[in-house]
Structure formats: structure tokens, C-alpha cells
Amino acid sequence: MQQLILASSSPRRQELLRQVGIPFVVAVPEVDEHAVHADSPAELVERLALRKARAVSVRYPGAIVLGADTIVVVDGEVLGKPADRAEAEWMLGRLSGRSHQVLTGVALVRGDEELVAHEETVVRFAPLSREQIQWYVETGEPMDKAGAYGIQGRAAALIASISGDYYNVVGLPLHRTVQMLTQFGYPIFTGGAG
């Protein structure tokens, strides 16, 4: 079977691939995410995912490299990972009682072959009190996540609704990723369920 390399240090992306039984090796890309610019959030996540996959692909010729990048967008403003607790509180205040978009870019690279797409999910937070925001920030959970929350963790108690791919919000849209891997000739649905 062809080797799949995950160009990400995200434990959530690793867990999602394990969940569906896709074997992979992790290789952390060295990419300056702040140096990437785009005209739209969708274009931004696709460019970032592709840049990550390309950065790792040069070290693994012949392998399929999977890169991904997730952002949160509210009122057209991109919210990345908070720099500190104050910024996490500010971000959660922005999301309180409102809908926002979560976009994940997914890129596959094998040599000169490239495939890029993105997924968008709409998430609505319940109205949050200052105490709820402080409680959540004090857990430490928001600090390494785009938009300062992890839907798969304690923030689940703060979410009013979701429209779209739940796994996209976690960090990797599994259905789209599997479709892309299949399109790339990676055999996912063959053999036994061993």
C-alpha cells in the first residue's frame, strides 16, 4: 500500500484518521502561516493546506502527503488560534449567540500531482455569559484551537447548533478527505475490516 504522510502535528487530525482506520505517518511541516495571503477565507485555507503538503512532500517522494488547515470566520473576519487567555475570551465573546463558519482546506500532494478542496460548516454558539467564557478559558482547552474552542471537548456544552460536517469543525472533514484519497488512488475500501 502506498504510504500516506499527514503533514500536521494536530492530535485531532491524527485521531480522526485513526478513527476510520487509515494508516499514516506524521511529518510536521515548517510553514510560516502568516506569510500566506488570499482574497477569501476559502482560498486561504486551501493555500495553507497546499503549502503544508508541499513542504512535507519534498521529504517523501512518491508518498501521498495530506495537508490541512482550519480557520473560524465570523462576519468575514478570520479567527486563528488565540495568542493568550485575553484573546481567547475576546474570540469567545465574538462567537457568543451567533453563527460562524468553520473552513478546513485539504490538500493532497504526490510528486507533481495535487488535489485541493475545502469544506465549510456553520456553527452557532449559545449566548454565553462572562462566567461561562471565563470557565471555558480556564480549562486551557481553547488555546491551541482556531476560534478558541474545541467542539469535541467541553465547548460542546456551549454549542447551540451545527450545520454541515462535524468532523470539519474538529479539524479534518473525513468524508471529503476519503473522497479525495480515493480519487488519488489510495485504497481505503479494499480488503477486510481486520
From Swiss-Prot:
UniProt keywords, alphabetically: Cytoplasm, Hydrolase, Nucleotide metabolism
Active site: 69
Signal sequence, renumbered to the chain: none
Pfam families cross-referenced by the UniProt entry: Maf
Location(s), subcellular: Cytoplasm
Cofactor(s) the protein needs: a divalent metal cation
Reaction it catalyzes: dTTP + H2O = dTMP + diphosphate + H(+); UTP + H2O = UMP + diphosphate + H(+)
InterPro entries on file: ITPase-like_fam, Maf-like
Taxonomy, superkingdom: Bacteria
GO cellular component: cytoplasm
Keyword Cytoplasm (UniProt): yes
Site (Important for substrate specificity): 12, 70, 152
EC primary class: hydrolase
EC number, UniProt record: 3.6.1.9
Molecular function in Gene Ontology: dTTP diphosphatase activity; UTP diphosphatase activity
Segments forming a coiled coil: none
Keyword Hydrolase found: yes
GO biological process: nucleotide metabolic process
Similarity comment text for this entry: Belongs to the Maf family. YhdE subfamily.
Role according to the record: Nucleoside triphosphate pyrophosphatase that hydrolyzes dTTP and UTP. May have a dual role in cell division arrest and in preventing the incorporation of modified nucleotides into cellular nucleic acids.
Identification of the protein by name: dTTP/UTP pyrophosphatase
Record organism: Symbiobacterium thermophilum (strain DSM 24528 / JCM 14929 / IAM 14863 / T)
